[in-house]
Design a protein with these regions (language model features):
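Cell-envelope/extracellular polymer assembly enzymes that use nucleotide-activated donors
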Residues: 98
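Surface-exposed interaction regions that form or flank ligand-binding interfaces
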Residues: 1-95, 106, 132-298
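Active-site beta-strand-loop-beta-strand hairpin of nuclease catalytic cores
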Residues: 101-132
């Protein structure tokens, strides 16, 4: 069957006008989250300062992982369109997607993971984080959510969204085009997946394997090819569907200033510059002028 697939000619597609990667959307909400947490250092109660520092460190690690994946994509020298950090909603389902890569023969949804510990995947597909001593002995295993399953949910949402916006393309073609992969961005992470189901094992790669993974997908004879017009139309649909999300403090954070009743973020002390209350101090929302919530200071 594979030999017959190899012999089957691919549909003819007009040559693309570009030959290297193009970032259609290149930014990360993680960077904005870190910047906000840095600003909140002076606003949080002293007892939670260490927790805030740990949260910043965790987000910074994730951001570095995204940068690693972005670097690999930029240096793939493949004619692909790339969208980074999409927040999509469809049928009351939401998805925070790290990267979507659009090529003529595939649409790849990438989940980036910067994991510090080694990972074990069992024969049932369960994921465990392995904690080691300084000598390398595993002293504890802790279950974690399955990133492959999570990413598949992102693919399912993407399929619904795109099939609604581009009904001319049959549903089975979306099933063929849409692919998913989890990229481990920490070169020191060891993944023990020898006993993992093939459908799980094949969806996890190291960041230095990403370019070869893209090439394999590009060369695969799926019988479905997108034109450049299709590729750019898909990118436009996803950019239009993307929703910006205001970052709110993690649960149980306590601040020395009130939170905005509308945005749930620490408010900023300000002084009225005009009007009957000129000179009076008040707390205003940092999202002004989008949000005009205030709390007067007696």
């Amino acid at each position: 069957m594979a030999f017959l697939d190899f012999l089957r000619p691919k549909p003819a597609v007009k040559p693309l006008s570009f030959s290297e990667p193009i970032f259609i959307k290149e930014n990360s909400s993680t960077k904005n989250q870190i910047e906000k947490l840095e600003k909140w250092k002076e606003l949080i109660i002293p007892e939670q300062a260490d927790r805030l520092t740990k949260d910043i460190k965790k987000l910074t690690s994730g951001l570095n992982g995204e940068k690693t994946v972005a670097y690999e994509l930029k240096n793939s020298y493949l004619p692909i369109l790339i969208l980074q950090d999409l927040y999509l909603k469809n049928q009351d389902t939401t998805a925070q997607i790290d990267f979507v890569v659009i090529a003529t023969s595939f649409i790849l949804v990438i989940e980036s993971k910067k994991l510090i510990d080694d990972i074990e995947v069992t024969n049932k597909g369960d994921f465990n984080r392995c904690f080691k001593t300084a000598t390398g002995l595993v002293y504890k295993k802790e279950g974690m959510y399955n990133p492959v399953t999570q990413n598949q949910r992102h693919v399912d949402l993407l399929k619904r969204l795109l099939s609604e916006q581009m009904p001319a393309l049959p549903v089975q073609d979306w099933d063929t085009l849409l692919q998913s992969v989890v990229v481990l961005a920490n070169p020191k992470t060891v993944i023990q997946d020898a006993n993992a189901p093939a459908e799980i094992r094949d969806k996890i790669i190291k960041h230095d394997q990403l370019i070869n993974h893209l090439k394999k997908l590009q060369e695969a004879n799926t019988g479905v090819l997108l034109s450049e017009q299709d590729m750019r139309a898909i990118a436009d649909i996803l950019v239009s569907a993307h929703q910006e999300r205001p970052y709110t403090p993690p649960a149980n954070y306590q601040f020395t200033v009130p939170l905005c009743p509308k945005c749930n973020v620490p408010m900023v002390r300000r002084t009225a510059k005009k009007g009957a209350k000129q000179g009076n101090e008040f707390f205003g929302c940092p999202n002004y002028p989008k949000c005009r919530q205030i709390i007067n200071i007696d």
